[in-house]
Amino acid sequence: MSLNTQRVSKFPFPKRDAKEREGNFEEVQLPYTLEEAMAEASRCVTCGNPVCIDVCPLQLDVRGMCEAVARGDMATAYHRIRETNALIGTTSRCCPQLDSLCEKACVVGSQGEPVAIGMIQRFVSDWERNVSRQPDPKTLKSTGMSVGIVGGGPAGLAAAELLKRYGHSVTIYEELPVLGGTAWYGIPDYHLPKDVLQYEASRIVDMGVRIKTGVRVGKDIGLYDLGSDHDALLIATGAKDVSKFDTPGSDLKGVYDGYRFLEDVFAGGVEKYLEHPTYDLGKRVLVIGGGDSALDCARTALRLTRGEVTIVYRRTEVEMPVDEILIEEGKEEGLKLKFLLAPKAYVGEGGRVTKTTMTVMKLGEVDASGRRSPVPTGETIDMGCDSVIVAIGRGPNTFLQKATGMATGPKGAVAIDENRMTSLQGVFAAGDVVTGESLVVKAMAQGREAAQRIHEYLLKIGKEHISLYDYYFTRRTSGRYYTGMLDGKEETLPPA
């Protein structure tokens, strides 16, 4: 087989021109055509041991998807990846495939450009949503058991979907008026359009999952009261606790919390925000931080102000825990980056910030994060600004832990055992409330694992754990991996 070492479009994917993105919240990434998707999928060499699947937290059947798309069979491709991923379009857009997951592991990439797995996955999800809606996944007969899930973000949605397929009654309790969690209010529309996430969440609801929005468990209803209504509970409340602002001047007008900023701009729809903007950013914006949220805040501020936006990070670009592609997109849009600087004080006039005094840093020894640690040099510089957006870290949501007294770990994260059960009997936990801020796909994988353990707990299967990725509702041939259609039929496993 001859190896096609280049993608069908400009690497890494087609996207809007930078000039077109000015003040524009439409999706930056442009979709493949049918011909492009089929041609790109045909670049897959169908490895006997697909590493791309192994590195995917959801064990997405990349090989089966590519084989099906290459021959134009989008329905089969959809069902292959829908088997373990209920948010196909969402993850295709927000996963760092090329930076750390499937595309980085693609063997084709060792000889050239890796197969554009995310773009192919996106094409399949868009096809299903816009062209040919596919049937809901099959579910097993009712077990008569009920599970309550606190939190309707990626972890909660993934868990709800799998538990429903196992035949359990499922109710999600969500504090916000919409489902999606951080994926809804924390990821800008130009990266993840709201209609994509809304559609995929609605498909889970269509399976029979009950939804109660506007309910804050621990305040509107107690966790123990909720426990009396269900046979098991899952805590999936995400990461919402913002690092404390202790820099002098943090109380000045114009100094904003980055996570609240993203939530206020996007949670109710960016169109509504643009009609009634609530942030006075001015034309010179500093964004403090070097992670995904800092980059999202900066690129959002660029679109809102069309001014000068600068990310200030205490390490260098090499240490930024962000997909390089997104950094490049920001630079294309005019984003500036300053490194080896950390805020020492916010200085203002008349109660409003006008400049930030920065401590100049240097890199020291490698710390626990695996990166070289920033060390103050003692030197300072001033940077003028009209506003500052601080996005320097978000820990697990600790509200329920404090309300119930359940055991916690570092930074107030929910402590769990090997079965993902908390210190409260029958109460499990998954996602960012356990790990702190992480990837959407990793939160989903934890949600599915928790669903599996809850299923075992309810049916008293014991500790003979079924490997989550060897136990499918649709059988895969050739060991763990699907290599062809089973006469167009899905096979349902008997109840465990």
Model-based region annotation:
Residues 146-171, 294-302:
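N-terminal Rossmann-like FAD-binding beta1-loop-alpha1 element of flavoenzymes
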